[in-house]
Swiss-Prot record:
It holds the Pfam family Ammonium_transp. This is Putative ammonium transporter 4 member 1. The gene is AMT4-1. InterPro entries: Ammonium/urea_transptr, Ammonium_transpt, NH4_transpt_AmtB-like_dom. Belongs to the ammonia transporter channel (TC 1.A.11.2) family. It comes from Oryza sativa subsp. japonica (Rice).
Length: 299
């Protein structure tokens, strides 16, 4: 059933099950990501120099914004969608926090296996993935219950946090684990059409279950197609050539907006001051001038 937060025309469709217009919110970024950053001919990826290293500017602000604003704010986003303090809202809030916490922990666990360390940025990505994934089905979750991607210049890691999670949750809402018939009747009444596929097969109503899965897929496809068309129309007009991309602050002024280097890295004069690589580099703090000055003093 379309949520009250969705546009009016959504209510007149075949009633896919997103809570809080989650299909629109969660999936709009997918085609925009592909068009803006993907290697698909619209705008193109960033320059190689920009892709070599792009550390976060401020991890503490990222953590504060994600935890205090996004996670806590999502409580109101999902929990407020029913527009009432009722069973819908309470179940939604509980499911939202459970899914988000689980996704964060799983992401950190995988991070430790693959990279051998735990990362704050990875924790934030896992948290956002959980928030996105649970949103379409937040009030329907029963508690007991690539090579292609490597070519996408996903600067903000949107494809897996929004695209995969949003699509997966939208499909699973009508497919396997969600919408147990007795539980779904609390929200949708006794309409026999609204049943998850797994439960429909069990009850001998496979047709109704397949119909609901088809509706979920159609809703996802519509949102993606709409955004690909609209975003392409906007972005094709603003595409620029690689030489123009290089004409930013680094090329014109010989400096970056945020001159922050990590421990143990070196500041290559060639990169911003036009010197050759034979000039070598020197250990950097947040202030390259101060580092060089300290070196000169100790000499």
């Amino acid at each position: 059933m379309a949520a009250e937060a969705a546009p009016e025309w959504v209510e007149k469709g075949d009633n896919a099950w997103p809570l809080a217009a989650a299909t629109l919110v969660g999936l709009q970024s997918v085609p925009r990501l592909v068009i803006l950053y993907g290697d698909c001919g619209a705008v193109g990826p960033r320059t190689e120099k920009d892709r070599e290293a792009f550390p976060p500017n401020n991890v503490l602000l990222t953590l504060a914004g994600a935890g205090l604003l996004l996670w806590m704010g999502w409580t109101g986003f999902n929990g407020g969608a029913p527009y009432a303090a009722n069973v819908d809202a309470s179940v939604t809030v509980v499911n939202t926090h459970l899914c988000t916490a689980t996704s964060l922990l799983v992401w950190l666990l995988l991070d430790s296996f693959v990279f051998g360390r735990l990362s704050v940025i990875s924790a934030v990505q896992g948290m956002i993935t959980g928030l996105v994934c649970v949103t379409p089905a937040a009030r329907l979750v029963l508690h007991k219950r690539s090579r292609l991607l490597a070519r996408v210049d996903d600067t903000l890691a949107v494809l897996h946090t929004h695209g995969v999670a949003g699509s997966l949750s939208g499909v699973l809402t009508g497919l396997l684990l969600l919408a147990e018939p007795r539980f779904a009747r609390l929200f949708f009444g006794d309409d026999p059409r609204y049943v998850g596929l797994a439960y429909a097969v069990r009850d001998g109503r496979a047709g109704s279950g397949l119909r609901q899965v088809g509706v979920q897929l159609a809703g996802i496809a519509f949102v993606v197609a709409l955004n690909v068309a609209v975003t392409s129309a906007v972005c094709l007009a603003v595409r620029v050539a690689v030489p123009q991309l290089a004409g930013g602050g680094d090329a014109i002024h010989g400096e970056d907006a945020y001159a922050v280097w990590g421990d143990g890295e070196t500041y290559e004069q060639y990169s911003v001051h036009g010197g050759g690589s034979n000039h070598g580099g020197f250990p950097m703090t947040a202030n390259p001038v101060a580092s060089k000055a300290d070196e000169m003093i100790w000499i």
